């Protein structure tokens, strides 16, 4: 996966000003230093060189003067320029050693991140932009670590809950099968009743085992999409038909409000899983003898699908329902409780489709809304 980073301009003005002032100071100091030295040795340097030429090389005064004139005095500007350059290089080396402290500060800040120390990262005033970035990164890493620990704790709690819930139907299955085994001459009606109860408990046990596998698979696989042209209206109708027995048992009804030609591009299996999870929650937490409204349609350049049911979700829980291993039913009811992965996976699937999912709730109703990118031909068709 290729991540494109935005070329965001950062404010390094303080550092730039300091660097500029250092450069100006180096040039000025080098020039002043060379000119000062020149003024100090003016006249003295010539006499000293003439003395060496006359005494060490046995030159007469006139020859020594000519050699000094042609070799040194006529090239004095070059010597001055060379001296200035050398001075600048020396001062630059000193300046670089001063600037090295900024890298030391950054390294210290990175060490704080690596060692996860509980303290703020502090840099020089000129590095305030980098200081803010490092502290932001530190807070982000700390939050991710806390979220990971919280998710792991929830996962452990869910595993414990499911282990407890598995024991309940398993105990019932063993009990009823023992009765059937001990009383082969049991009346047919009673035997049929026990078999029916045992079968229901076995189905529940299968569901809980599937939840265990769901927990195992969640962090081991990446959601991949196989997109195709989907008849969204037909998918919603088929889904509500499948939920009819579960809904009718409590006097509930799912009503679809959507155009029959509504289509969308996506992975049919993954989207069906999303809608099934939402409807499953609506069926589990809505009031008896109520209607679950499913409204779908084109809104601008997105296809919107809403599930509205009676009942409310507290605000503190509403903000967390899309987190993995989060369960609304704190009592972990064996009939409605799950691993808390349904809505978390639903969100991942919708995000993979380039859409979004969110929930709203008031005192009377709860609404889950899914928005998916509309196909261009559908948008053009509705506009024409």
Swiss-Prot record:
Induction: Up-regulated by vancomycin. Residues 221-384 are annotated as: Involved in low-affinity ATP-binding. Exhibits higher affinity for ATP than GTP. Its EC number is 2.7.13.3. It is a multi-pass membrane protein. One of its GO terms (biological process) is cell wall organization. It is an enzyme of class 2 (transferase). The chain crosses the membrane at residues 21-41, 76-96. The modification Phosphohistidine is found at residue 164. Pfam families: HATPase_c, HisKA. Residues 161-376 form the Histidine kinase domain. Changing residue 168 to K: Reduces phosphatase activity, with phospho-VanR as substrate, significantly. No affect on autophosphorylation. GO terms for cellular component: plasma membrane. Phosphorylation of VanR inhibited by EDTA. It is found in: Membrane. Member of the two-component regulatory system VanS/VanR. Functions as a sensor protein kinase which is autophosphorylated at a histidine residue in response to environmental stimuli, such as glycopeptide antibiotics. VanS transfers its phosphate group to transcriptional regulatory protein VanR, thereby modulating expression of target genes. Binds directly to, and autophosphorylation activity is enhanced by, the glycopeptides vancomycin and teicoplanin, in vitro. This is Sensor protein VanS. It comes from Enterococcus faecium. The lineage of its organism: Bacteria, Bacillati, Bacillota, Bacilli, Lactobacillales.
